[in-house]
Design a protein with these regions (language model features):
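N-terminal glycine-rich flavin-associated loop
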Residues: 86-106, 132
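Short hydrophobic "helix-edge" motifs at membrane interfaces and signal-peptide entry regions
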Residues: 46-47, 94-95, 143-144
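Glycine-rich, Trp-frequent "lid" loop and neighboring beta-strands that shape
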Residues: 62-64, 106-164
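Amphipathic, small/basic residue-rich leader segments at the start of a protein or domain
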Residues: 1-89, 106-117, 121
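Short, solvent-exposed polar/charged micro-motifs at secondary-structure junctions
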Residues: 39-43, 64-65, 96-99, 133-136
């Protein structure tokens, strides 16, 4: 059985292939997650609709329709190439969708665009030495001290914490 996406998607695949070929020389190996080169690359991917496709423009996304086939084509063509992939992580994959669905307008404006661009890197830290993933037994506490939060406790397995 041979499955085809259709002419519209063939055109889109050709566009993605062209972009990939034009950008084969981009190399971010050894660059910090916070480097301006990474932020610029991330923005270029957004501008072309190869990242944050369905996130509204007003929040820093491409503003396109959700289209699983286009998303699949992007993933396939990027996987065949050595060009840098878009940033991912907790902020982009977990926080941004939550803010878009449940956040206040102020939170969306403050955090979504800089997170998508890679200007803000997030981590999650809920595992503790005596708790594992049992969230009911967590001991870390945060207390408001004037205008700042003071957090006391210990976390383990904090992905991307050194960049957050």
């Amino acid at each position: 059985m041979e499955l085809e996406y259709g002419p519209e998607y063939d055109e889109f695949r050709a566009e993605v292939k062209s972009f990939v070929k034009e950008n084969e020389g981009v190399n971010l190996i050894g660059k910090s997650l916070r480097s301006s080169d990474r932020v610029d690359w991330q923005q270029k991917l957004i501008d072309h609709g190869y990242f944050a496709r369905s996130i509204p423009k007003e929040y820093g996304g491409f503003g396109g329709d959700m289209d699983i086939l286009k998303t699949r084509i992007i993933a396939e063509e990027f996987a065949k190439s050595p060009i840098p992939k878009p940033l991912g992580g907790q902020g982009i994959q977990m926080l941004v969708p939550t803010l878009l669905e449940l956040g206040t307008e102020e939170q969306k404006q403050a955090y979504v665009k800089p997170t998508l661009r890679g200007e803000i890197i997030w981590c999650q830290g809920y595992s503790e030495p005596n708790s594992g993933s049992d969230l009911a037994s967590l001991q870390t506490k945060g207390e408001l001290d004037g205008d700042e939060w003071v957090i006391n406790g210990q976390k383990i397995w904090t992905s991307t914490a050194k960049f957050a």
